[in-house]
Amino acid sequence: SGVPIIPVYFDGQNSALFHLMGKIHPLLRTVRLPHELSNKKKKTVALRIGHPISFSEIEDFTTLQDLGAYLYNRTYALESHLYSHDFSNLNTYGEYVPKPVDPQVLAAEIETRSSDKLFSAGSYDCFFSSYKDIPNIMHEIGVRREESFRNVGEGTGAEIDTDKFDTYYKHLYIWDREKKGIVGAYRLGMCKEIIKQYGIDGLYSNSLFRYKAPFIPHLEKTIELGRSFVALSHQKEALPLALLIKGLFYVLLKYPDIKYFIGPVSISSWYPPLYRTFMIYYLKQKHADSKFSGLVDPIEPFEPQAGRVDVGAL
C-alpha cells in the first residue's frame, strides 16, 4: 500500500493461565480473551510508540519472514526505555561540593609553565605538562574530574579524582585566561616510557584488559588516553572539546614515532542493558580492527542483555 509501519509496544502480558490454555488448544486462548481484557480495568498500561518504518525500508526485505522478524524486533526494542536525562538518581555518593584551588594560585602556576604551552585560541591556552610540575593544577583537575563524572552518575566518591597513574602520566589541559579556570583535560600515557620504567602493569588500561604478547610491540608506538572531561561550566560550548582534540594532534607533532591512540571509554549505566548491547554490537560489527581485536581481552567481558530482541536482525 506504500504506507509506513509504526511499531507500538504495550507493556505487560496476559496471565499465565491464558498462555497455559493456549498450549492445550488455541481456541481456549481465544475464549479466554474477554476475561483478559476485563481484568485490566483500573490498571495503567504503558504504551510506547516507535519511529515510523518507511515504505522504502520495508521494500528492502525480500521475504515476509524476514520482514516479520524485523518488525517483531523493532517492536520489542521499545521494551527498553530511557525515562529521563537526569543522571542525579544514579549518583550513589551524594551531593558533591567541590573544593577548588584559588584561581590566583592556579594563574601563578600557569605563568611558570610557558614552556608547556602548545597553542592559544581566543581566551584559551592549551598546555601539555608533567605531574610534578603542576601540583595545584593537578588538584584542580582532580576536582573538576570528580565534579564532571558525578554529574553523569559516575565518579570515585572521593573529594578529588586522582590516582597513582596520574603521577607518571602526562596531562593535556585547557586554561581559560579570562575566567582563570581549567576548562577540560586529558590524561596521556606514553606507553613506551611507562612500560620501560614500570612494566606492562604500569598502564592503566592493563587493569581493565589483558594484552597478548604480539600486541606489546605496538604499544611502543602508542599513547594511552583516558580520564578526559570538560568542566561543567563549559559543557554547553563546543570549543573546549575541539581544543582538547586539537591538543592531541599537537602532542603527535612532539612524538613523531607515535602511530596509535588507545584507551577505555565508559558507557554510562544510565543506558538500559539493551541499548548498551546495541552499542557494543554496532562497534564490533562496524569498527572492530581485525588486526588487533584478537590481541586484547577484557578482564570482565561485557555480557549482552537483549531480552526478546535479536540484535542482529535490526
Predicted regions and their residues:
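Acyl-donor binding region in acyl/amide transferases
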Residues: 156, 193-314
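Short amphipathic alpha-helix that is part of the acyltransferase structural core
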Residues: 118-161, 167, 171, 183-184
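Non-catalytic C-terminal accessory region of glycerolipid acyltransferases
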Residues: 1-98, 307-314
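Short catalytic/ligand-binding loop motif for oxyanion handling, primarily in non-cytosolic enzymes
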Residues: 14-18, 56-58, 182, 196, ...
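Short, histidine-centered active-site or binding-site loop motifs used for metal coordination
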Residues: 51-53, 130, 227-232
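Glycine-rich phosphate/pyrophosphate-binding loop shared by adenosine-nucleotide-utilizing enzymes
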Residues: 180-185, 223
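Conserved N-terminal entry element of GNAT/NAT acetyltransferase domains
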Residues: 92-132
